[in-house]
């Protein structure tokens, strides 16, 4: 099958974009990921950095990646049930190992588990319309659960939202020293992530996967629509997303990031805007692809997308080495941490370009495929039930 270079580029953008938000999760305590006032006070530049990243990136790149993951499920259907289930089960295992032994911000476990459910929904959907509508419904269910959690939550702040000094020191201790203590805390994090996945986030993740599968089945993610359609759709969707999200960002600032409002209720506009912006970003890339494809950097980012799993794990390897093993954790604020993003991006891009000069797949992708072959046997041409 001939590769869709535009799709690879969009996937590469998603992987690189995720690091814009993850860098604060590597370099700061967990509470800082959503709460810029996690330590009780906040500088103007920290607030503006948070606001900018929240507007353009928070949730958007993860949503874009979920969309493409769903598109991948649609593309895998001809390989058959055993192949798909083996592939996703191996991803679950890899995500569990990654989350337990390396980093507490893993997304692979969640994607693998939800994918094991969603691929059947994709297979059994009778039409593009039903697949898309089911995805929208599941996503809205997730938003409804988030609203319910906000309504029943206590107005008093949580230690997870604004940790005290002892909690921050303890997190710094186990992240820098590693060992059994770190594994124990990461195991707790995996458990909490699974609870959140089952209760709320899994609905949204499943919804975006089904929407991505619908867009692939319709030909939209294959680039089969006009450039004018992609451009108009992209500008409109991004504008809608920004319009939804911007007032919520301003309101969180006005409320001084109060727990009940900002941890739950005002997350909803961000979550609602994310699909609009994510699909809008993808649409603009497709719409301007004739111009974008002239640049060598764009084709290099497409190489990152071809090795998405390898590059996601490479980001973990580089950032955990810098912030945990070399002791840079909590040495930089949110804006300063962005200075680390570009060197990591360059590492992703250079490694991908050089590797793909000699090999067809990334190293982790190759291993994943070989293990899938051993577990499932050769892929078959018709999806078995």
UniProtKB/Swiss-Prot annotation:
Q: Which residues form a coiled coil?
A: none
Segments crossing the lipid bilayer: 12-32, 50-70, 90-110, 132-152, 195-215, 233-253, 272-292, 312-332, 335-355
What kind of membrane protein is this, topologically?
Answer: Multi-pass membrane protein
Q: Name one GO cellular component term.
A: plasma membrane
Q: Does the keyword Membrane apply?
A: yes
Which InterPro entries is this protein grouped with? Bact_Transport_Assoc (IPR052529), DUF418 (IPR007349)
Reading the lineage from the top rank, the first entry is: Bacteria
Q: Where in the cell is it found?
A: Cell membrane
Report keywords, A-Z: Cell membrane, Membrane, Transmembrane, Transmembrane helix, Transport
Q: What does this protein do?
A: Involved in transport.
Family assignment from sequence similarity: To B.subtilis YxaH and YrkO.
**Name of this protein:** Uncharacterized protein YeiB
The lineage is: Bacteria, Pseudomonadati, Pseudomonadota, Gammaproteobacteria, Enterobacterales
Gene it is expressed from: yeiB
